[in-house]
């Protein structure tokens, strides 16, 4: 079994195809925008200015650079996520191993000063992404199936230094997203088919649900959304500074294609049971609005000794803006619905940096990701859990212009138990995940 995301469109095809991953932060948020940040568990990112990647987190940091600076790299994710489960009605197994694939998450950053007060920057990252994929005949296919979300964020930002202490930054985000949702009848399909036939429904009407691999829902689409980000930087002196950053909510209004193997004559019966809208394989227009939530973060950096610094962050994401997945047809009918019910969540991180000499810099970090998914809303389509990060990394400077960052993190998610569905459609699950992340970036100052 595997999990994956696939996003291709014109010039974005190569970059987006590389970003194929299960979300390795809370919910379906991605943090992997730099390798130096990976090595410190992304602690202090709104206040550290050791490479151009930090500017994507806090645009006010642009004023910390006195030369045009470039950074490019990728983070490799090697996850291990298993799900064990069974049907509460029949006891049939719903186990799935290694449901998350290995993946690369690339990043590209550039920052340039204009003068002593103004500067600008640009970046290409991915802030949100999710994929769950089970085999077509998976027993709990009505909940598993395929759920793919991929985003690529294009950011352009500028900054202004008011004085020696205060700097302000503002950025514009253009987010390209592509999503796909597929659901299958699973073990519930043949059971429902038998019950309907026993109640006098012609067998021919149940052909769209009578096998586990019957595709009862398929929705896909791609679209652009737009948002903004802002940051403030306060410098007490060259060794102590703090940052406050904000990234706005981005609404993606998908208009795509929908189809279902279910016979439309069964919509009244199966719709009342929560199953998707049937089209008997015919494709029709479908729309879905996805809210990518806003995020606040406060960060600090303190060089407490000539060779030592500490850095820390607390991020707050308004996940309550993501309450449902609801696809509608042209006539306003509900094609597919899933109650998500996320709640706001936080992330805290603490790290330290050791400046060994002019060539070598070493860093470590620890972080805790609070899951936004309430216990009664957990799902195998978004198998989220609280996570602990342990990170380490280094930078080697070849000279005053060129350097390379290497970072590694180990993440462990707590084991969670939950039930999805009711009655004959109820399944009990247990999920646990862990992952290794490795990243490298090349930096160059002109």
From Swiss-Prot:
GO cellular component: cell outer membrane
Entry membrane topology: Multi-pass membrane protein
Molecular function GO terms recorded: long-chain fatty acid transporting porin activity
Pfam families associated with the record: Toluene_X
Compartment(s) of residence: Cell outer membrane
InterPro entries for this protein: OMPP1/FadL/TodX
Main localisation: membrane
Stretch forming the signal peptide: 1-25
Keyword list, A-Z: Cell outer membrane, Lipid transport, Membrane, Signal, Transmembrane, Transmembrane beta strand, Transport
Function of the protein: Involved in translocation of long-chain fatty acids across the outer membrane. FadL may form a specific channel.
Family of this protein: Belongs to the OmpP1/FadL family.
NCBIfam families: PRK10716.1
Protein's UniProt name: Long-chain fatty acid transport protein
Organism: Escherichia coli O6:H1 (strain CFT073 / ATCC 700928 / UPEC)
């Amino acid at each position: 079994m595997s999990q994956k995301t696939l996003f291709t469109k014109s010039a974005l095809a190569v970059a987006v195809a590389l970003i194929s991953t299960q979300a390795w932060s809370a919910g379906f948020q991605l943090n992997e925008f730099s390798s130096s940040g990976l090595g410190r568990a992304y602690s202090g990112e709104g206040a550290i200015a050791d490479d151009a990647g930090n500017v994507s987190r806090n645009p006010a940091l642009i004023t910390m650079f006195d030369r045009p600076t470039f950074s490019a790299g990728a983070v490799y994710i090697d996850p291990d996520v298993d799900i064990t489960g069974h049907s509460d009605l029949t006891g049939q197994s719903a186990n799935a191993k290694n449901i998350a694939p290995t993946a690369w998450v690339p990043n590209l950053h550039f920052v340039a000063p204009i003068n002593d007060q103004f500067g600008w920057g640009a970046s290409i990252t991915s802030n949100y992404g999710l994929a769950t994929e089970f085999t077509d005949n998976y027993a709990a296919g009505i909940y598993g199936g395929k759920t793919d979300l991929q985003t690529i964020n294009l950011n352009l930002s500028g900054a202004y230094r008011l004085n020696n202490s205060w700097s302000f930054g503002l950025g514009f985000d253009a987010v390209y997203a592509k999503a796909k949702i597929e659901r299958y009848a699973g073990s519930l399909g043949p059971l429902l088919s038998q019950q309907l036939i026993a109640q006098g429904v012609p067998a021919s009407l149940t052909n769209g649900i009578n096998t586990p691999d019957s595709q009862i829902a398929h929705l896909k689409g791609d679209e652009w959304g737009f948002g903004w980000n802002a940051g403030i930087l306060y410098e007490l002196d060259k060794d102590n500074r703090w940052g406050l950053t904000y990234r706005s909510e981005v609404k993606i209004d998908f208009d795509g294609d929908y189809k279902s193997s279910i016979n439309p004559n069964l919509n009244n019966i199966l719709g009342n049971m929560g199953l998707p809208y049937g089209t008997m394989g015919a494709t029709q227009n479908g729309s879905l609005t996805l809210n990518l939530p806003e995020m606040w973060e406060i960060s600090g950096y303190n060089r407490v000794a000539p060779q030592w610094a500490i850095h820390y962050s607390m991020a707050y994401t308004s996940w309550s803006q993501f309450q449902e997945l609801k696809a509608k047809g042209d006539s306003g009918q509900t094609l597919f619905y899933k109650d998500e019910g996320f709640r706001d969540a936080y992330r805290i991180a603490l790290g330290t940096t050791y400046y060994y000499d002019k060539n070598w810099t070493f860093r470590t970090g620890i972080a805790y990701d609070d899951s936004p998914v309430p216990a009664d809303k957990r799902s195998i389509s978004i198998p989220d859990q609280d996570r602990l990060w342990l990170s380490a990394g280094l930078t080697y400077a070849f000279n005053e212009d060129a350097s390379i960052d290497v970072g590694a993190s180990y993440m462990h998610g707590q084991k969670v138990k939950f039930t999805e569905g009711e009655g004959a459609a109820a399944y009990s699950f247990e999920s646990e995940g862990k992952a290794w992340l490795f990243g490298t970036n090349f930096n160059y100052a002109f």
